[in-house]
Amino acid sequence: MSVKEEEIKKFSSSVKMTRHDTPMLDELENGPWPSFISGIKSLRDNHHEPRINKMTNDLLGQLEHSYETRKGYWKGGTVSVYGYGGGIIPRFSEVGDAFPESKEFHTLRVQPPAGNYYTTDSLRQLADSWEKYGSGLVTFHGQTGNIMFIGSTTENTQHFFDEINDYGFDLGGAGPCVRTAMSCVGAGRCEMSNINEQKAHRLLVNNFMDDMHRP
């Protein structure tokens, strides 16, 4: 174990929280396939940010409760950022009193760049911003083709959007708007390319995103 790993383990063990028992979820870690439960547990047990430890702990607690009762406890609502009529999937917990750290767990859908081409710097920026304001759970990419940033409070939804918008990313894919825009890498990879795919992508995104922007 590296020095950094030891520091993270020591730090996370000092976080004052009672880990929820999750015998049913534990079963999902068995078998040959990667488990999303293992990923959430890793954030709960190993992340250096106490807010994320607690948030993912209560997320696991609520999910175990759902498995026990065979009922979902997420309800919708209205959450948005200034000037937008979509891009956010609101999630409020009906059992927030029992699991207060995850009682608000909204998802932000963010438009991917043309060709799904990311620099390592942009990925680090997104990850750092999400660790600052969200749960640390990210999906590349959701069913709509967007980046899914899963698990934010209502207040931090605005803060996270403001930060990523400053370095060029925009919302999309949820609500009364076009789900996403996709394009191939184009001339950067294909000998048969005969248009500027990235420019076409950009023009279409700008056109349809206007439908989502609100004064």
Enumerate the language-model features and the residues they cover.
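Small-residue-enriched alpha-helical segments and adjacent helix-cap loops
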Residues: 2, 6, 26, 41, ...
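Charge-rich, low-complexity segments
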Residues: 1-94
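N-terminal glycine-rich anion-binding loops that anchor highly charged ligand groups
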Residues: 89-105, 133-136
